[in-house]
Amino acid sequence: LGILYAGGVNVPLSIKLTESTDLLFRIQHSDSRYVIVSEQQLPKIRKIIADCPKVEKIIVLDPLETYEENEMPISEIIAMGEAYLKDHADDFRALYESVGPDDYANISYTSGTTADPKGILLTHRNYTANVEQGASVISCEKGDVMLIILPLDHCFAHVAGFYTMMSYGGSIATVPVGKTAIATLKNIPIAIKEVRPMIMLSVPALARNFRKSIE
């Protein structure tokens, strides 16, 4: 949301991407200036950062004992933002009010199974229209909880999930990522019991498996 408010463009990427091909291509092709990454995925970025000259900073979500020259913790970004807003709240308000419906908000990449991945440009109006459409078919109230069991780099997850629930004032929970795909799948029933969601965002294959288990 901070990136969108600032007029920037999000480029969500899958944690499954390999650094030497898929990840490197997407960072270079999108002209990304900043990379936000977890500690678990940081080694991938460190291996290819020398080949990404346009990347200015790597922002790490988890605290580390030491940071390399071009890395910084997310806590520092938050502190910088709070300090900036104390004296520049009007400037920031003018910035996000200048963002128009046709300005780019997101680049979503195709899988690239037969050729180089294609970057799909989505505007702010793409997002708001999808949220309005989602609100017409997803009935929920403020305070409701949605469990998302889909890859978060997919448009369906962050539009029908994150942004639609935000428009309602709802909450979002995600499934913890395991060391393997099977481990992640095993975390789904654990998350359901813990979160007790009113809504689950799924795809037909997973929904069929749930139905078989219920029947």
Regions found by a protein language model. Give the residues of each.
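Short hydrophobic/charged patches on amphipathic alpha-helices used for structural packing
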Residues: 24, 46, 93-96, 189
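Conserved pre-ATP/AMP-binding loop-to-beta segment of ANL
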Residues: 60, 75-109, 116, 139-145
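A short helix-loop-beta submotif of the ANL/AMP-binding
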Residues: 1-20, 28-34, 144-145, 163-176, ...
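Structural core segment of the AMP-binding/adenylate-forming
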Residues: 5-80
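Helix N-cap/beta->alpha junction signal
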Residues: 38-41, 103, 203-204
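Conserved AMP-binding A3 loop
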Residues: 105-131
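Conserved AMP-binding/adenylation subdomain of ANL enzymes
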Residues: 128-147, 152-215
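Conserved S/T- and glycine-rich ATP-binding loop of Class I adenylate-forming
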Residues: 3, 35, 104, 110-113, ...
